[in-house]
From Swiss-Prot:
Cross-link Glycyl lysine isopeptide (Lys-Gly) (interchain with G-Cter in ubiquitin) mapped to chain: 74
Main location: membrane
Gene Ontology annotations for the cellular component aspect, listed alphabetically: cilium; membrane; mitochondrion
Protein name stated in the entry: CYFIP-related Rac1 interactor B
Gene: Cyrib
Observed effect of gene inactivation: Myeloid-specific conditional knockout mice have a reduced survival following Salmonella systemic infection. Upon infection, they show increased levels of several serum pro-inflammatory cytokines and chemokines produced by activated neutrophils and monocytes.
Amino acid sequence: MGNLLKVLTCTDLEQGPNFFLDFENAQPTESEKEIYNQVNVVLKDAEGILEDLQSYRGAGHEIREAIQHPADEKLQEKAWGAVVPLVGKLKKFYEFSQRLEAALRGLLGALTSTPYSPTQHLEREQALAKQFAEILHFTLRFDELKMTNPAIQNDFSYYRRTLSRMRINNVPAEGENEVNNELANRMSLFYAEATPMLKTLSDATTKFVSENKNLPIENTTDCLSTMASVCRVMLETPEYRSRFTNEETVSFCLRVMVGVIILYDHVHPVGAFAKTSKIDMKGCIKVLKDQPPNSVEGLLNALRYTTKHLNDETTSKQIRSMLQ
């Protein structure tokens, strides 16, 4: 596995840059196992979280009925009874974001530590790199689902309004134990974000950088830009792409590439779109545009609307027009 990742700085594809990150089969080495096992405990719950979010239908009908007939106690009880278990789910999603944040920080600690360069880390610790990719993949999928489900914020707003009304009237409320006021405030801020999981990762990465002052910020941002390069080259090099045994790996790679670009753009002082950026943005956008349009529109939108520096004056007109 030692030679799987090489020549990351080589951009001349005719020379055949030789690196491949095994997203499908990477297994932890002895030195990776401790962090790997900690992160794995979190990641094994990720698919269940996505399934719960995908099947989240909301209590819109019950809430509308209750609001339209404020004097009808039965309708009020019905709406409250529908919302309380949903808020339990929203609490579970929020708590998972906190666990994901801790997992990410563990991975960043391992993948940015001295004396190795980001390239060497990704080459030596492929299983941790794969977990980092899985966190990014989960994050984009979660935020895509959340963004298209207005019921989440409607349900939570109704829950908070009803709870405060019950408190004023001294009505005991089942469900209050589920989410106390301080937690409700934090959940409100989380769900008010267009892309709450990405914001969690971005804040966690920024915090990691500020708490590790002895570690140059480049160790972290270079880890991100290197991961973006790996994904781009694996996708645009037929020799590497043909090694994927599962078609899903292509969409996994695309999502990870976009996730890592967005994270880099939020964490790096000048962002991903500046001329000095270590990410080949034109190359990455071209790779996206070379896919079937309906499979990447969501990812292109993520670059358009959730990055931080796209509309800066320093961003080249060519990159902006590629994303129009």
